[in-house]
Amino acid sequence: MRVVIQRVNHAAVRIDGETVGQIPKGLLLLVGLAEGDGEEQVVKAADKIAKMRIFEDEAGKTNLGIKDVGGQILSVSQFTLLADTKRGNRPSFVHAMRPPKSSQLWEEFNQELVKRGLTVETGEFGADMKVELENDGPFTIVLDL
């Protein structure tokens, strides 16, 4: 499982010009699920993200978590995060989990975040989406589990 975590001032995801998810200040999560991922990875990722202190306090130190700042999450499924680029010029996605299992696991991940008291908006699994965001920092972390 790979999650790209971006601290944002705001973010939105659109499909065919219609906004399907948007947040003010918070985290944009780009979520890639690999073959072999399961509940263990989903729970660990949700725990880590819910507790991660990546927002600045009054002194400018990254001491605050998403709940401390009243932030929200926009979760977007992105299988291309599992691209293998070692050979040739065309990325291979053989390590990415296939639907419908990947769709179900992504939904479970989002529910685990909600269970931890977070407000979660989402894109639409498998759709061609346009993601708009304003990075804060920028502050981006890649979480591999």
UniProtKB/Swiss-Prot annotation:
GO terms for biological process: D-amino acid catabolic process. One of its GO terms (molecular function) is Ser(Gly)-tRNA(Ala) hydrolase activity. SUPFAM superfamilies: DTD-like (SSF69500). It comes from the Bacteria. It is an enzyme of class 3 (hydrolase). Its main location: cytoplasm. A motif (Gly-cisPro motif, important for rejection of L-amino acids) lies at residues 137-138. The keyword Cytoplasm applies. Keywords: Cytoplasm, Hydrolase, RNA-binding, tRNA-binding. Its EC number is 3.1.1.96. One of its GO terms (cellular component) is cytoplasm. It catalyses: glycyl-tRNA(Ala) + H2O = tRNA(Ala) + glycine + H(+); a D-aminoacyl-tRNA + H2O = a tRNA + a D-alpha-amino acid + H(+). It is found in: Cytoplasm. An aminoacyl-tRNA editing enzyme that deacylates mischarged D-aminoacyl-tRNAs. Also deacylates mischarged glycyl-tRNA(Ala), protecting cells against glycine mischarging by AlaRS. Acts via tRNA-based rather than protein-based catalysis; rejects L-amino acids rather than detecting D-amino acids in the active site. By recycling D-aminoacyl-tRNA to D-amino acids and free tRNA molecules, this enzyme counteracts the toxicity associated with the formation of D-aminoacyl-tRNA entities in vivo and helps enforce protein L-homochirality. PANTHER family: D-AMINOACYL-TRNA DEACYLASE 1, D-TYROSYL-TRNA TYR DEACYLASE. A Gly-cisPro motif from one monomer fits into the active site of the other monomer to allow specific chiral rejection of L-amino acids. Homodimer. Belongs to the DTD family. This is D-aminoacyl-tRNA deacylase. It comes from Lactobacillus delbrueckii subsp. bulgaricus (strain ATCC BAA-365 / Lb-18). The lineage of its organism: Bacteria, Bacillati, Bacillota, Bacilli, Lactobacillales. The gene is dtd.
